[in-house]
């Protein structure tokens, strides 16, 4: 009797639809070429103003306190007075325990409140803790949530574990935006970065 062939997981099947075998040197050369060709045309005041308006102004220090975060937020409140020709930043990003401080201090309507969550930055904690932290950040006033993928799970080939965490956290966020950070420095290779990107995107549409 022949042994059954191992069944391919839906995650491996999804990755098989894309070319994920990338050469790091070739990718680096392509990136350098794009930078050389495109930077001069985009090194303009208009582009810089646009990019500034995309910034999440961030304070993630172990020394952060209610007072320091309040002062940090006040700088954003005063930005329009000091720089009337520039659009403000997109968001203020803080740890979840400071979401309420920002909410109570922020006076600018079009600046969002972003919170890192889910065991940021290592993502090494229980999924129950990740969900609870995310839910509490939203309850305290966060508009957006930033998470880091479970890099350890990804590198170990546990794509299911990584993707299910993303799905559960997005379900917690509901209509709120959730940013998935890949931690590319830990992924090392272009192939890993592409695989993690694909899996993260597909997780949000429930592969």
Report each predicted region and the residues it spans:
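Conserved anion-binding
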Residues: 134, 144-203
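Glycine-rich, proline-tolerant flexible connector loops at the mouths of alpha/beta enzymes
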Residues: 59-65, 81-101, 118, 122, ...
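Charged, compositionally biased N-terminal leader segments and the immediate start
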Residues: 2-55
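Active-site mouth loops of central-metabolism enzymes
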Residues: 55-66, 115-129, 152-157, 181-192
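Conserved, mostly hydrophobic/aromatic
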Residues: 56, 102, 137, 180
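Alpha-helix-loop-beta-strand connector modules within alpha/beta enzyme cores
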Residues: 96, 100-118, 159-179
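Structural preference for beta-strand elements that scaffold enzyme active sites
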Residues: 52, 91, 110-114, 144-148, ...
């Amino acid at each position: 009797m022949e042994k059954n062939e191992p069944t391919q997981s839906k995650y491996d099947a999804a990755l098989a639809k894309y070319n994920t075998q990338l050469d790091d040197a070739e990718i680096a050369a392509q990136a350098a070429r794009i930078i050389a060709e495109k930077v001069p045309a985009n090194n303009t005041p208009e582009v810089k103003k646009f990019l500034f308006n995309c910034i999440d102004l961030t304070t993630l220090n172990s020394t952060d306190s209610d007072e320091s975060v309040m002062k940090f937020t006040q700088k954003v409140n005063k930005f329009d007075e000091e720089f009337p020709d520039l659009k403000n930043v997109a968001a203020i990003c803080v740890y979840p325990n400071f979401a309420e401080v920002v909410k109570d201090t922020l006076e600018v309507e079009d600046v969002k409140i972003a919170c890192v969550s889910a065991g940021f930055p290592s993502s090494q904690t229980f999924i129950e803790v990740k969900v609870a932290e995310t839910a509490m950040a939203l309850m305290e006033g966060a508009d957006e949530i930033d998470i880091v993928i479970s890099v350890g799970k990804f590198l170990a080939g546990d794509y299911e574990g990584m993707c299910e965490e993303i799905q559960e956290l997005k379900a917690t966020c509901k209509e709120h935006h959730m940013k998935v950070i890949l931690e590319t420095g830990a992924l090392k290779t272009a192939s890993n970065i592409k695989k993690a990107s694909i899996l993260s995107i597909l997780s949000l549409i429930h592969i």
